[in-house]
Amino acid sequence: MQVILKEKVENLGVLGDIVNVKPGYARNFLIPFGKAVQATQANIKAFEAQKAELEKAEKARFEAAVAVADAIKDKVYTIAAQAGEGGKLFGSVGIAEVAEAVSNQSGKKIEKSQVRMPEGVIRSIGEFELTVHVYTDVDADIKVNVVAAEA
């Protein structure tokens, strides 16, 4: 199925590209989430008329994402968690806790789907480097300091 992309989609294309995708991917993800429209002759003509407006909106979203990334990057965010002897946590610190800590301590809204933990959940006290994927091609490297909670 051919679709016209209305915004940049990772590993697929950029705004205005006409790409071939599997019908299920188009029907269940791209079209319902407003990332693409089916590539009919009428849609191609309508898209050409709206292209400048869509590019301006895409640029505004990108600039907003860069501003959020600049506000949160290169900072240390502290999370208090219950820990036993030897610095081992009772439980773990996952993406939800990291997203909440970054949102609360920076004042910027971060969704848990944006947090990348390549080594999995945190299970000990210490400082860890993580990535927040703010937008397509916009990542912010942050440090999370997990400390023992006061009893």
UniProtKB/Swiss-Prot annotation:
Question: Mind naming one GO cellular-component term on file for this protein?
Answer: ribosome
| Pfam families from the UniProt entry | Ribosomal_L9_C, Ribosomal_L9_N
GO molecular function per UniProt:
rRNA binding; structural constituent of ribosome
Q: Which GO biological process categories is it annotated with?
A: translation
Please indicate if the UniProt record lists Ribosomal protein as a keyword: yes
| Signal sequence range | none
Task: Give UniProt keywords alphabetically.
Answer: Ribonucleoprotein, Ribosomal protein, RNA-binding, rRNA-binding
Q: What does this protein do?
A: Binds to the 23S rRNA.
Concerning its family, UniProt says: Belongs to the bacterial ribosomal protein bL9 family.
Write down what this protein is called. Large ribosomal subunit protein bL9
The organism named in the record is Francisella tularensis subsp. holarctica (strain LVS)
Q: Which gene encodes it?
A: rplI
